[in-house]
UniProtKB/Swiss-Prot annotation:
Keywords annotated in UniProt: Acetylation, Calcium, Cytoplasm, Disulfide bond, Metal-binding, Nucleus, Phosphoprotein, Repeat
Classification via SUPFAM superfamilies: EF-hand
Superkingdom field: Eukaryota
GO cellular component terms given for this protein: cytoplasm; extracellular space; nucleus
Tissue specificity of this protein: Smooth muscle and non-muscle tissues.
Source species: Oryctolagus cuniculus
Gene Ontology terms for molecular function: calcium ion binding; calcium-dependent protein binding; S100 protein binding
Modified residues (N6-acetyllysine): K24
Modified residues (Phosphoserine): S2
Residues the record lists as binding Ca(2+) 1: S28, T30, E35
PROSITE patterns to which the protein is assigned, alphabetical: EF_HAND_1, EF_HAND_2, S100_CABP
Name used for this protein in its record: Protein S100-A11
Domain annotation EF-hand: ranges: 12-47, 52-87
Biological process terms in GO annotation: regulation of cell population proliferation
Length: 102
């Protein structure tokens, strides 16, 4: 059996992190608001510590909760991860020195 690729390991890691926080308050397939805050303050501590607005995490939760059930399912969680990945990528692109085009 072949070893997982780097991308496959990243996917496994995302699933494991979601499962680590989901279910502590009841539903094992969703993040409650408390679980979401725990995830953000632990796994994305650099992001949360730099926030000046104390309501930003509440607004993020509401925006991510597409079906308005007060929980984040895995798809809604991935929307957060994808948005953060896009923002990080854009920062890297802006910070990279310009490349010569031939």
């Amino acid at each position: 059996m072949s070893r997982p690729t780097e991308t496959e390991r990243c996917i496994e890691s995302l699933i494991a992190v979601f499962q680590k926080y989901a279910g502590k308050d009841g539903h094992s397939v969703t993040l409650s608001k408390t679980e979401f805050l725990s995830f953000m303050n632990t796994e994305l501590a650099a992001f949360t510590k730099n926030q000046k607005d104390p309501g930003v995490l509440d607004r993020m939760m509401k925006k991510l909760d597409l079906n308005s059930d007060g929980q984040l399912d895995f798809q809604e969680f991935l929307n957060l991860i994808g948005g953060l990945a896009v923002a990080c990528h854009e920062s890297f692109v802006k910070a990279a020195p310009p490349q010569k085009r031939f």
